């Protein structure tokens, strides 16, 4: 899509006459404000009604988790938690002292228990409930201690706690159902406003317990069109954008205002089957689909070779990856043979769903996938849906999309994928059910010995590939464009954090 300067100015709500005021400081980010144009910004004011890494980054400006993964250390570090212990079917956490919410109330264990209760409230719109399905009780013996009691030893519980943000119970008791209209957390920024559709504004918390951020105001604007984000960056309307198209990198590197940063991403892209729909309940058809898709060719032809094909059910850097496993080779003739065996000698009609603009070149990817699958004997109808609708149908309680293109962000442990997509009853994303696989996944979840747990994950991965439960594709490089005078800390998890930024 080509977009003119005048078209862009119209899109952002000003006429051409307003351009000079807009652009007069366009070649340098403000020292007080950073404006971020992002393809994925929260679609709901409820911070628990999401399950997406970049959106977690939005909310983390104002509220914080107990722990988070340090990607450099490849281990968990405390945020609100000072320490933690694994005690059989219990996890005991000690909270840091002298932390206050934005309303002045001190952080206590009661706030943690209150927030977990909100996260488990599926009827209230939370998508976080599956993370606590194995928790039977949350105990608060004193203000600084939280104990999670689980059905059985749960060695992987720390992974479940990442991105689980804590809100103020005092605010919850005061505002009730209106709590999310002005969420109160402990984070480095305070909530200012939210506009439905994906515009958020945060202002600095000058009394933040972890030290004052350099940037005073952070603005997120949801812009799904690549061309619109690029125009905003080049004009100075935006200081930072995500999902820079790879074919634009060389040109933008010559731009006087723009710098390009790249990092290997943790988001794994794949095509998911929903076994509640025919023909995906047929293993032969799923295998045929795997033989029909050429991921390396997609990386080469669409992403200019900037990508990392996945050769098993998870990428090589994920805990539990098995280098012995290989992806299905591209073999359209083999696909046709399998379809004939499955009862489709004249081809098979399918629908492929995606959300245009959510991921880099997602429309082009799905068009190429459809063309590849036609050669394998499939007749593919492409259907694009706005992200909120797509997510509602695909997400935790969805189960309404038969076949879809999706990216799983911040995938560091194979358990996350196996549990959320292939364990019976965890979610409705694929409606796959295999008691033998369930047993292996559940066994590794309670195995504290990491070597033994990885061996179990590899057994599960082998079964997943044999059953052709989905089509693993690739990891991509996350490509960002930003003002040259903006310094930030790059992360592989797609979070864009204002307190990691400063102006030079």
Regions found by a protein language model. Give the residues of each.
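A structural "hinge/loop" feature
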Residues: 40-56, 79-80, 105, 127-128, ...
């Amino acid at each position: 899509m080509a977009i003119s300067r005048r078209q862009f100015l119209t899109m952002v709500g000003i006429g051409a006459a307003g351009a000079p005021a807009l652009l007069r400081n366009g070649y340098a980010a403000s020292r007080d404000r950073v404006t971020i144009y992002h393809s994925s910004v929260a679609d709901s004011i409820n911070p628990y009604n999401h399950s997406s890494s970049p959106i977690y980054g939005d909310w983390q400006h104002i509220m914080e988790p107990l722990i988070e993964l340090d990607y450099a250390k490849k281990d968990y570090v405390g945020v609100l938690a000072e320490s933690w212990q694994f005690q059989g079917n219990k996890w005991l956490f000690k909270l840091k002292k002298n932390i206050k919410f934005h309303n002045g109330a001190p952080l206590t264990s009661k706030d943690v228990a209150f927030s977990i209760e909100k996260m488990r409230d599926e009827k209230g719109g939370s998508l976080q409930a599956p993370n606590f399905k194995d928790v039977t009780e949350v105990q608060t013996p004193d203000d600084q201690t939280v104990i999670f009691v689980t059905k059985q030893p749960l060695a992987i519980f720390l992974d479940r706690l990442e991105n689980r943000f804590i809100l103020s119970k005092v605010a919850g008791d005061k505002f009730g159902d209106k709590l999310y209209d002005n969420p109160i957390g402990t984070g480095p920024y305070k909530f200012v406003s939210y506009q439905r559709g994906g515009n958020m504004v945060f202002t600095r918390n000058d009394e933040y317990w972890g030290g004052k951020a350099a940037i005073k105001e952070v603005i997120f604007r949801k812009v799904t069109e690549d061309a619109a984000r690029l125009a905003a960056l080049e004009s100075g309307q935006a200081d930072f954008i995500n999902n820079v198209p790879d074919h634009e990198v060389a040109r933008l590197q010559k731009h006087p205002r723009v710098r390009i940063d790249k990092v290997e991403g943790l988001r794994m892209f794949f095509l998911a089957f929903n076994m509640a729909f025919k023909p995906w309940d047929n293993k032969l058809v799923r295998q045929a689909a795997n033989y029909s898709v050429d991921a390396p060719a997609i990386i080469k032809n669409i992403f200019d070779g900037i990508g990392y094909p996945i050769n098993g059910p998870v990428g090589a850097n994920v805990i539990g990856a098995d280098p012995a496993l290989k992806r299905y080779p591209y073999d359209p003739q083999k696909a046709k043979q399998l379809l004939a065996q499955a009862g489709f000698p004249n081809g098979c009609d399918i629908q492929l769903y995606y959300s245009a603009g959510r991921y880099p070149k997602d429309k082009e990817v799905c068009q190429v996938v459809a063309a590849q699958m036609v050669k394998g004997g499939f007749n593919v109808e492409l259907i694009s849906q706005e992200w909120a609708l797509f997510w509602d149908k695909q997400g935790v309680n969805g189960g309404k999309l038969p076949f879809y293109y999706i990216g799983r962000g911040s995938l560091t442990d194979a358990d996350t994928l196996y549990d959320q997509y292939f364990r019976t009853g965890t979610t409705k994303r694929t409606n796959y059910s295999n008691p033998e696989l369930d047993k292996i996944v559940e066994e590794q979840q309670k195995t504290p010995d990491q070597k033994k747990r990885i061996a179990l994950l590899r057994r599960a991965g082998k079964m997943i590939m044999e059953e052709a439960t989905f089509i693993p594709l690739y990891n991509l490089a996350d490509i960002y464009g930003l003002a040259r005078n903006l310094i930030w800390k790059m992360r592989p998890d797609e979070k864009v954090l204002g307190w990691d930024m400063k102006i030079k």
